[in-house]
């Protein structure tokens, strides 16, 4: 392989310690001219020149997103940038475009501000975490006490807020398996639902209690009063309202008690007569069959 001598039109001056301060350095070839002229290099240089903001590190997908496990996993992630974002397969971003667009500048400032917030981890011993865990435990206990299942809660929330709520959502919240941000949002919704559910339960219990109070206690009739009522029933099984009032005053009972006793006594008499007639009929039938 033959070697060719290097020729150039540039002039090189040997600099010593005295001349270095007086003579300026001049370079006739820029860095861009030294690179091969290809589309690949042009795209790389243009892309690198066009991007003026640093890409924040994203922990989404690398660390668990649950709270109650480790502090580093509580950091929310705003964006997930693919690995090929800065590759040469994308068209170059020109410098004048980003420099003259005020929206791009605002976007970069907002991204820097949010990236600083992303980097701040949440303390696992913070009051917010403890309050969230306490609410999740209390919610489960109160939900079971009210008689609702996780499916009931998920369907109730889905009917109001959309289909993203389900039994799985409630289960993950109670087991502390949601991200801190989503858990805080769901906490406010579940707190409102729990308040309304307890109000409905209180109204239902009040209504049931009122119905139970309307039902009177069973009245106990003494043996002497029963004998007196039996004698009156033998004389007249269907007394009038005046007769019932008079018997109630004599026996020191309420009029309604005496009236109900006569109704029950007539029903019992009717059942006895019906049973007796059926027995007599069956006996006579057997007697005829024997002949």
From Swiss-Prot:
It holds the Pfam family Homeodomain. GO terms for biological process: B cell differentiation; cell fate specification; cell population proliferation; determination of adult lifespan; inositol trisphosphate biosynthetic process; negative regulation of transcription by RNA polymerase II; pituitary gland development; positive regulation of cell population proliferation. Transcription factor involved in the specification of the lactotrope, somatotrope, and thyrotrope phenotypes in the developing anterior pituitary. Activates growth hormone and prolactin genes. Specifically binds to the consensus sequence 5'-TAAAT-3'. Keywords: Activator, Disease variant, DNA-binding, Homeobox, Nucleus, Transcription, Transcription regulation. CDD domains: homeodomain (cd00086). Residues 214-273 bind DNA. It is found in: Nucleus. A motif (9aaTAD) lies at residues 5-13. SMART domains: HOX (SM00389), POU (SM00352). This is Pituitary-specific positive transcription factor 1. Residues 124-198 form the POU-specific domain.
